[in-house]
């Protein structure tokens, strides 16, 4: 940047550096710095390093208004490097509270809500069900679509039992993850547990959306993902120091939280399947009753495996992030 220009630039996906230059009487210049997020909120306490044409280096810290003045800068070009906001990272939009959350719901209530077709994004599955007023009567009469009906149970249970969700698609994705893991063969594939862990991260209160966003970027780019890319994504999702946030993530705590979240869905699913088996048997539909008991057994297996498998999956995220965060240049440069 030359002394006769004042430039405003957008860098790093979220931050907005601005510089103005004033000539001093003694032939040097004063450079006024300002750094803000794209919404205009100042970046607080970020460090800066200004190097002028003569090689002189000026270091300091922006104030809480994102500003600083640097005097005595030699004529000619200069370069500025900024650090991160000194505050702890906080997402712009914390993970959303689930308005349907009802931890006291029992199996009967979940069945009744499922019969109503409360989960809107399963409407396509409902259209595949013929004639009967509710799918449960279709079950008893033998008009039963295994996949669509079981997914409906899981989706409605998740919608009832998860306190927060990143987005509505999380419930759909969680149902699909669990459906996949009902197969013994699929339970042996690490990628299926990794997919489950990614969905569940989005359901962790406050930081779930931000962590899930960076996990998706890291998984897509793998070892080739740069630190700069990862932090730019996170910087676009909140304010504060993204690198400190990622370096201090407690992945084993995330494993514990996500294990509890999915268990809170699986256990009611077991109760629902057991209740439906009892109901089918009372109606003389013994084969269907056996199907639901088998379903309950498979879900129990998943629930038992969850803690160890999610620890392994979160451990993989920990290793991947450690490799990525070991790379990269300083994030914000202005010349």
What are these regions (language model features)?
Residues 24-26, 63, 73:
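Surface-exposed coil/turn segments at beta-strand junctions on protein surfaces, enriched
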Residues 187-246, 256-260, 290, 311:
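Hydrophobic, membrane-inserting alpha-helical segments
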Residues 81-181, 213-231, 271-282, 290-335:
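Cationic, glycine-rich low-complexity segments
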Residues 55-67:
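Short, acidic Ser/Thr/Gly-rich low-complexity loop/linker segments typical of extracellular
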Residues 39-53:
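Short, ordered, surface-exposed loop/turn motifs in non-cytosolic proteins
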Residues 1-22:
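A general sequence property marking short-to-moderate contiguous segments
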Residues 43, 68-80:
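Short Pro-Gly-centered beta-turn/loop motif in secreted/extracellular proteins
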Residues 24-43:
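Structural motif
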């Amino acid at each position: 940047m030359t002394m006769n220009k004042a430039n405003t630039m957008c860098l790093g996906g979220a931050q907005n550096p601005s510089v103005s230059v004033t000539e001093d009487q003694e032939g040097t210049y004063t450079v006024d710095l300002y750094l803000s997020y794209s919404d205009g909120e100042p970046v607080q306490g970020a460090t800066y390093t200004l190097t002028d044409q003569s090689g002189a280096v000026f270091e300091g810290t922006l104030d809480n208004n994102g500003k600083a003045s640097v005097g005595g800068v030699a004529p000619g070009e200069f370069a500025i490097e900024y650090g991160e906001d000194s505050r702890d990272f906080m997402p712009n939009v914390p993970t959303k509270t689930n308005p349907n959350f009802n931890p006291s719901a029992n199996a009967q209530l979940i069945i009744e809500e499922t019969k109503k077709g409360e989960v809107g994004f399963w409407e396509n599955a409902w259209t595949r069900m013929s004639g009967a007023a509710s799918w449960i009567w279709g079950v008893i009469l033998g008009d039963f679509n295994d996949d669509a009906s079981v997914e409906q149970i899981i989706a409605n249970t998740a919608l009832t039992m998860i306190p927060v969700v990143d987005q509505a698609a999380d419930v759909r994705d969680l149902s699909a993850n669990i459906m996949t893991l009902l197969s013994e063969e699929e339970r042996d594939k690490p990628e299926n547990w990794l997919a489950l862990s990614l969905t569940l991260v989005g359901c962790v209160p406050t930081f779930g959306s931000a962590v899930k966003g960076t996990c998706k970027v890291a998984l897509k780019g793998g070892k080739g993902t740069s630190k700069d890319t990862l932090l730019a994504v996170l910087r676009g999702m909140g304010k504060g120091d993204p690198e400190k946030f990622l370096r201090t993530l407690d992945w084993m705590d995330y494993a514990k939280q996500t294990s509890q979240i999915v268990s809170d869905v699986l256990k009611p699913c077991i109760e629902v399947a057991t209740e439906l088996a009892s109901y089918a048997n009372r109606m003389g539909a013994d084969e269907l009753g056996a199907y639901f008991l088998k379903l309950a057994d498979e879900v129990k297996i998943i629930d038992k495996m969850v803690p160890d498998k999610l620890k392994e999956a979160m451990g993989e995220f920990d290793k991947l992030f450690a490799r990525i965060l070991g790379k990269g240049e300083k994030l914000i440069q202005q010349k």
